[in-house]
């Protein structure tokens, strides 16, 4: 049975503006029409690790994310079935015991750094977009976000950037732009995806 659900995948480097782009795109539709899903909700639970080991974990590698669950959730949403989405706590690097009920919508926007690097996940998208922005701007944005929202110091952010973020970007994220239907140079130059195009 063919689904009427339209799924858009939006990827790009950390700090590239993909979340802002996804949010702005969602505003083109009513709350009854559109659903926004973030890759970040699908980080694997590290509760079994010590606090120090969690901090050393490579969160920028695809293996740190439960893409199998994300794919299952997208499949269920296309069938009109509500899902129980994990709630991830970035301060403790673990999933909360509670979940978030997500109802199916006609348009689903999925955003995340690595979503275009997963071949099985690509099959779920009707349209794919890659947000491209210079490295320094991405880093500056990440520093500001992680300090204000995730309780980290600038030194911690810079160490993580040099040891995992940048290497994983070069290995997985940057090559995934070849899977994009549209490559957008920064969120300021957002593409105009009209409702008629997404129907």
Question: Regions from the language model: what does each represent?
Answer:
Residues 35, 44, 48-92:
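Conserved nucleotide-sensing/catalytic segment adjacent to the nucleotide-binding pocket
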Residues 96-148:
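ATP-dependent NMP and nucleoside kinases share a basic, alpha-helical "lid"
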Residues 2, 103-104, 144, 166-199:
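NTP-dependent small-molecule kinase module
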């Amino acid at each position: 049975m063919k689904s009427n659900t339209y799924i858009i995948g939006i990827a790009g480097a950390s700090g590239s503006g993909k979340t802002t782009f996804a949010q702005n795109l969602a505003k083109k539709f009513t709350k009854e029409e559109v659903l926004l899903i973030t890759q970040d909700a699908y980080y694997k639970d590290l509760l079994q690790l010590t606090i120090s080991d969690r901090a050393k974990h490579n969160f920028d590698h695809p293996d740190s994310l439960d893409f199998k669950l994300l794919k299952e959730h997208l499949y269920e949403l296309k069938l009109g079935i509500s899902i129980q989405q994990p709630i991830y706590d970035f301060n403790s690097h673990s999933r909360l015991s509670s979940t978030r009920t997500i109802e199916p919508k006609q348009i689903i926007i999925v955003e995340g750094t690595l979503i275009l690097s997963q071949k099985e996940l690509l099959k779920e998208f009707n349209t794919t977009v890659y947000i491209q922005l210079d490295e320094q701007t991405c880093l500056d944005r990440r520093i500001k976000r992680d300090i204000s929202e995730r309780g980290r110091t600038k030194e911690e952010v810079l160490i993580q950037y040099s040891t995992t973020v940048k290497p994983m970007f070069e290995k997985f994220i940057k090559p995934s732009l070849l899977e994009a239907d549209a490559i957008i140079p920064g969120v300021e130059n957002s593409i105009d995806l009209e409702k008629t195009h997404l129907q």
